[in-house]
Amino acid sequence: MAENLKRLVSNEALRTLQEKLDSWLKEYNTNTCDQNLNHCLELIEQVAKVQGQLFGILTTAAQEGGHNDGVETIKSRLLPWLEASFTAASMGKPVDSKVPSLQNTFDRERRKDPSPRDRDMQQLDSNLNSTRSQLNQVQDDLAETEKNLEETKNRSAISLLAAEEEINQLKKQLKTLQAQEDARHRHTDQRSSENRRSEPRSSEERRCEQWSSLKRNADQRDTEVTSDYKKQLRNLKEEIAVLSAEKSALQGRSSRSRSPSPAPRSRSCSRSRSASPSTAVKVRSPSPNRSKLSNVARKAALLSRFSDSYSQARLDAQCLLRRCIDKAETVQRIIYIATVEAFHVAKMAFRHFKIRVRKSLTPSYVGSNDFENAVSDYVICHLDLYDSQSSVNDVIRAMNVNPKISFPPVVDFCLLSDFIQEICCIAFAMQALEPPLDIAYGADGEVFNDCKYRRSYDSDFTAPLVLYHVWPALMENDCVIMKGEAVTRRGAFWNSVRSLSRCRSRSLSPICPRSQIGLSTMSRSRSPSPIRCGLPRF
């Protein structure tokens, strides 16, 4: 910029301009109109050249200032001057500095009437502030909840420690009493033997009778004391089991509140172990925490897990399938069939597991009347020995040969492994209840039962027949514990018949090698009836 400024000064253009103005003023009255116009145009051209050089210097100076420096100066001085100059030139009036500039007019209009963008920004700011306040409130609530959970957990741990300490004291007292009784018995035996040696033969029989009566009385007292202590010990063990269950529930709830998304089930690691009860009898001892839980508590926990599977795990599985399948009906059919197959496989696995437990416990309970109770207690204590991964593989194989969802193969059912594993674990644990829980039988085209099912939102609420099922109903004997969900449409019976005929033709087609593999596998495990293959199994 300094070079341009030096060049402008060295040209002496402004001095020449002043000299021309003075000479024109002297000759103005003697010149003609054309001569005056020529002088004026020459001056304008010279001024334009000077002005061009000044604008170049202005541009260079603005560039040296960066992106932000000089912006306010240009807005406050250059823009109003250009506006006034162009306005005066267009109207033929001299430049008046008192005329309000266009920039000032724009500023006044902007302050007077804010633009929609400004209003949107203000609305977004207000929404952001409210969201931040809500987030802070939720964080405070979460911190308070975690604090309460921690306090409850500490109280439960203290109660558990106190109960264990009391049990240890009772065990010590029991050992002390047993030692005293043994010492008393030994002392009584020694006295009786001495008396038998010192007294004559006639009194020896009387002494024996007295000693036997004393021994019977002592044994009776010992039995009563031992039974009392055993009752107290059993009650304390039951209290410890309940406290342990509450502690585990609180720990699971606190871990779920800390994690934002449901992680893979931690039970899957323990359930993937060997399911052989014979080895478990040698290595593991029955845990009182599981065996002493009441049937009502286990039933309530399983119902809660089954409800969570319907409300959360089912929707997660639908989201996974919707990435590969666009049709919502197919997705819901796949999830329903997966649930039904999971219950079927879990029930079969429970029967085999109970048979193995019977075989392994038979030598230990020969001639005992509590054999069935021992089997039930062992099964309840060792539900984590269930090989859920093997059941998941069986369910996926059964789904691969189901004609309703496997032809044509549009998705790999391994996507649903986590969902199937959770349903298998729930169904397996439900078989250990008294009485066991099971799902209701459902077939496409059946009459809609309002006691068992709810209609889905996209159903025809006047249709009497079920087009397909979304979720099975949960039954206890013949009573409905939890309703399922079904879709009802007009003409559902004929649609089911047509789909069944198509399934038969496709499953028996020699062109598709997958159907042949599925039929061979199915003939080994289940009945090859096409109706049984086409409809859900239990």
From Swiss-Prot:
Ranges in coiled-coil conformation: 118-186, 220-256
Q: Which GO terms describe its cellular component?
A: cytosol; intracellular membrane-bounded organelle; mitochondrial matrix; mitochondrial outer membrane; mitochondrion
Biased segments, Polar residues type: 123-137
Q: Where is the composition biased (Low complexity)?
A: 253-278
Q: Which GO terms describe its biological process?
A: mitochondrial protein catabolic process; mitophagy by internal vacuole formation
Q: Which residues carry this modification: Phosphoserine?
A: S85, S156, S159, S285, S287, S509
- Residue ranges annotated as compositionally biased, kind Basic and acidic residues, are 106-122, 181-209, 216-227
The protein's UniProt keywords, in alphabetical order, are:
Coiled coil, Cytoplasm, Lipid-binding, Membrane, Mitochondrion, Mitochondrion outer membrane, Phosphoprotein
Query: InterPro entries of this UniProt entry?
Result: MIEAP (IPR026169), MIEAP_C (IPR031981)
Q: Does the keyword RNA-binding apply?
A: no
Which portions of the sequence form the region Interaction with YWHAG/14-3-3 protein gamma?
Answer: 1-273
What molecular functions are annotated in GO for this chain? cardiolipin binding
Using the UniProt annotation, give all residue ranges assigned to the region (Disordered): 92-137, 174-227, 247-292
**What Pfam family is a match for this entry?**
MIEAP
Oligomeric and partner information: Interacts (via coiled-coil domains) with BNIP3L (via BH3 domain). Interacts (via coiled-coil domains) with BNIP3 (via BH3 domain). Interacts with YWHAG/14-3-3 protein gamma; a protein that also plays a role in MALM.
- For this entry, the protein name equals Mitochondria-eating protein
The species is Macaca fascicularis
